[in-house]
């Protein structure tokens, strides 16, 4: 009987330790990994509360993101538009691990820096890219992708 109690106690401590690890990773500040203009747009949308502190838990709920280089962002939680934030880099986008829909719209002359490896978006179901120079596109890890649209992107296949 003591052995069973000891085993259950150890299992519970392991679960508790794992929860602490998960919670601590959710509280990791990744603000320095984001493009400043992308941070400004996310702040204006009230997706983040502070541009100097972006916790993974702050952005984990975002499933639908639309970016324009002229720029406005919308998501399921808040459909407000931002004022002009000229985003030239997608640096930081890779931290949106819950994205199900992503739409990127440019003006045909745009070349975005830091094009992410889209295959890291495991939950992505819809990807639409319009008028952004995109020489290559890796979606090999997007097993849930059901809708892909790339228009006027100069994509090399």
What are these language model-derived features?
Residues 88, 110-113, 115-118, 131-135, 138, 153, 156:
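Leucine-rich repeat
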Residues 10, 56-58, 151:
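Sterically constrained small-residue positions within well-ordered secondary structures
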Residues 139-140, 144-150, 157:
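A detector of tandem-repeat and repeat-rich interaction/domain scaffolds
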Residues 14-108, 117-122, 126, 131, ...:
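N-terminal capping/linker segments that flank leucine-rich repeat
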Residues 40, 154-157:
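Short intrinsically disordered, low-complexity coil segments enriched in acidic
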């Amino acid at each position: 009987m003591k052995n069973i109690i000891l085993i259950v106690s150890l299992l519970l401590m392991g679960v508790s330790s794992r929860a602490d690890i998960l919670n601590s990773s959710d509280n990791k500040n990744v603000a320095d990994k984001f493009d400043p203009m992308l941070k400004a747009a996310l702040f204006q949308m009230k997706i983040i509360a502070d541009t100097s502190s972006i916790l993974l838990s702050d952005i984990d709920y975002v499933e639908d993101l639309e970016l324009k280089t002229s720029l406005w962002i919308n998501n399921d939680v808040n459909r407000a538009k931002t004022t002009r934030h000229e985003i030239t880099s997608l640096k930081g986008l890779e931290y949106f691990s819950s994205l199900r829909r992503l739409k990127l719209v440019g003006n045909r002359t745009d070349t975005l820096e830091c094009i992410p490896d889209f295959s890291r978006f495991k939950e992505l179901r819809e990807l639409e890219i319009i008028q952004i120079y995109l020489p290559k596109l890796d979606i090999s890890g997007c097993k849930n992708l059901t809708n892909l649209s790339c228009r006027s992107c100069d994509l090399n296949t």
